[in-house]
Amino acid sequence: MQLSVIILNYNVRYFLELCVLSVQKSLENINGEIIVIDNNSSDDSCAMMKQRFPKVKLMQNTVNLGFPKGNNIGVSQATGEYICILNPDTVVAEDTFVKVLAFAKKENNFGIIGVKLIDGTGNFLPESKRGIPTPFVAFTKITGLYKVFPKTFGKYYAEHLNENQTGKVEILVGAFMFMKRELYNEVGGFDENCFMYSDDIDLSYLALKNGKSNYYFHETTVIHYKGESTIKDGTYMKRFQEAMNFFYKKHFSVSFFFSVFMKMGIVFF
């Protein structure tokens, strides 16, 4: 088996249907499998999957186990040499997996590959490529300084590359993360203690610590309907702060300046 596509679903039945249809089309010339994990949805996601896609492996959790654990369960059932963590509110292109697989085979030391993500209206989603959110980098993001001075404060969204350039980046978004299954298992998969918005940062960073290079690959485009960039409320800011706190406590030390930066950012937001 070449590729296992892991889709974790929670109450997005219509998006899920579109997503699975697009993945099936993209896998037509690939020895691949689709694994859908449902986190105890209250809509008819599972009924739809059984009716529309009876050959797709469906795992039904009896409780909502969250993003990290749900995906870890899915990967545990995968048999592909490569895996792709894919959000259910995405639509991949027909050429997505063929192109990403070809790129992966050329880059012997790749860790995780992400692709060009756009929203439902065709706008590029900047979280497609990011840098390690050091305290200052996180501050420039949370205050919006990166928008005012993108050349000076552009590290959060890896502005050393434009959206139409392929190259090395540090952090990729959990909506689309392509990697070898062996690497996923070596680093322990997603940390199940992670807060929302830190799980993909943590996994990307673990790949780097493992001596790998992460890549943004621009030559295929994936629609992500509910991207992080579309969320602009107080709840998002609180979760972002929690995510940064978790990441720094795990990998670095949380300094006084980090706490000040985060509090200032929330005030200015």
Question: What would you call each of these model-derived segments?
Answer:
Residues 91-127:
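Conserved donor NDP-sugar-binding/catalytic core segment of glycosyltransferases
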Residues 22, 38-47, 63:
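A conserved acidic beta->alpha catalytic loop
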Residues 21-31:
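Short, acidic, metal-binding catalytic loop of nucleotide-sugar glycosyltransferases
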Residues 132-169:
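Short, flexible, basic/aromatic active-site loop/helix in glycosyltransferases
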Residues 60-78:
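Glycine-rich, basic loop-to-helix element that forms the pyrophosphate-binding segment
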Residues 83:
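Short aromatic/hydrophobic "clamp" motif used to bind/position activated sugar donors
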Residues 205-269:
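Active-site-adjacent helix/loop segment of glycosyltransferases
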Residues 162-221:
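A short, conserved alpha-helix in the catalytic core of glycosyltransferases
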